[in-house]
Amino acid sequence: MYRTVRTLLAAVLALVPAWAAAQGAYPAKPVKVIVSTVPGPLDAYARIICEKIALSLKQPFVIENKAGAAGNVAAEYVKGQPADGYTLLFAIDTTFTVNPPLYKKLPFDPVKDFVAISVPVTYGQMLTVHPSVPAKTVKELVELAKTKPLNYASGGNGSPSHLVAAYFYSTAGVPMTHIPYKGTGQSVIDVIGGRVETLFAVTSGVIQHVKGDKLRALAVSSIKRSDLAASVPTIAESGYPGFDVSFAYALMAPAGTPDDIVQLLSREVQKAMAQPDVVEKNRAADYAATGMDPKQSAAWLVSSRERWAKVIKDNNISVD
């Protein structure tokens, strides 16, 4: 009997290394990373980070673009994939923070269908005006808006530039006419051309126009000043203490993905973020590295979603 027990125990112990190796084998094949936009800033950043992770884990991380519906197309696709760590989503955080309260019919649940791996970077927006606008500070712009009608451009209804503007102007208590465009590019062109008076836009996208005196920068929306424009104050420093609006990139996985895989990928993102060329990329693009782990990343998405839900409701913003 004891011999039988010893034989069985030996057989079980012999299997343990093989089982452990199988459990630690991730990734054992290429990982597909779905990017929710066409090639552009998000795509470029996803490629940089995924290249670093691929080198570290010794498996390809293959980028595939699935653009459409402000990230909803990509999210719906990834939601339907096996929760095994081999299909991930790299998206702008608004897919999970803005789209749920903005779209009446959403093809995914941001909480039930996904798990956060990392929110690696955040970035603010810069409040700019056409040089003809007689306001050189946020306070002067607010006072001016109280005495005469002013307007602001955005990249479209529900876009980040629309949301941060609606949030700020409602906070300041001044009426502003919203002029939406189909994309940020044309909105910037029309503010430079003097056809629209003000605009919030990603700092890295307008800083060259500020330096060329085609736009005047009044403030940035993030809690910290931008390294690209250190002399430009924050909105919080300009009379609105606590005002802090940043958007972010998010690496997500289908709900049910094993936690050890989620934690591994999170650590790999942080390793990538610490590499000198990524640090320089962050500086040049005005990205602030967060150091967020999966739990902190999930909390970021929840708090941002709650804020934007209120802004969307209070300002009657809709895309349907």
What are these regions, as identified by a protein language model?
Residues L15-A22:
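N-terminal signal peptide c-region/cleavage motif recognized by signal peptidases
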Residues M1-L9:
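Bacterial N-terminal signal peptides that target proteins for export
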Residues T122, V206-A274, S303-E306:
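C-terminal lobe and pocket-closing loops
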Residues A22-K112, K148-N151, N157, S161, ...:
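N-terminal (or domain-start) structured segment
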Residues I53, G80-Y86, P101-Q186, I235, ...:
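Hinge/capping helix and adjacent helix->loop/strand transition within the periplasmic-binding protein
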